[in-house]
UniProtKB/Swiss-Prot annotation:
One CC-aspect GO term: chitin-based extracellular matrix
Tissue: Arthrodial membrane.
Residues modified to Pyrrolidone carboxylic acid: 1
Origin species: Cancer pagurus (Rock crab)
PANTHER family: CUTICLE PROTEIN, CUTICULAR PROTEIN 47EF, ISOFORM C-RELATED
Span list, region Disordered: 1-22
Superkingdom assignment: Eukaryota
Pfam families assigned: Chitin_bind_4
Glycosylation sites noted in the Swiss-Prot or TrEMBL record: 83
Start and end residues of each Chitin-binding type R&R domain: 20-85
Single annotated GO MF: structural constituent of chitin-based larval cuticle
Official protein name in the record: Cuticle protein AM1274
Keywords (A to Z) from UniProt: Cuticle, Glycoprotein, Pyrrolidone carboxylic acid
Length: 116
């Protein structure tokens, strides 16, 4: 927030904590920021959460993210999260050839030249 701008109003805020590891939290601001999280204990005694958040970009687009955080880590899902390009078929074929050569005992020097 810039120094000369007024604070952004929180138009909705809710929070519940059952005291047993289950909780819900939600807030929404006047400028379109929103977050909602539900937490719960897992069978192994850890804490897990699911939720979502959204916020506007300067160009008017709305970024929306849903997520799970549990024993598998933080797993966000959003159209705005970059995904790697597919590996080209010729690269996959080359990697398969190298794997086979390694299985056959091939070795290479520091410059990548095959020794055996």
């Amino acid at each position: 927030q810039l120094a000369n701008e007024p604070p952004i109003e929180i138009i909705r805020q809710e929070s519940t904590d059952n005291g047993d590891g289950n909780f819900n939290f939600l807030f929404e601001t006047a400028n379109g920021i929103y977050k909602e999280v539900s937490g719960y204990p897992t069978a192994n005694g850890a804490q897990a959460m699911t939720g979502s958040f959204r916020f506007p970009l300067d160009d008017g687009q709305i970024v929306e993210v849903s997520f799970t955080a549990d024993e598998n880590g933080y797993l966000p899902v959003s159209d705005f999260i970059p995904t790697p390009h597919p590996i080209p078929a010729h690269v996959l074929e080359t990697l398969a050839i190298v794997d086979e050569l390694v299985r056959q005992g091939a070795t290479w020097d520091e410059q990548g030249r095959r020794i055996t």
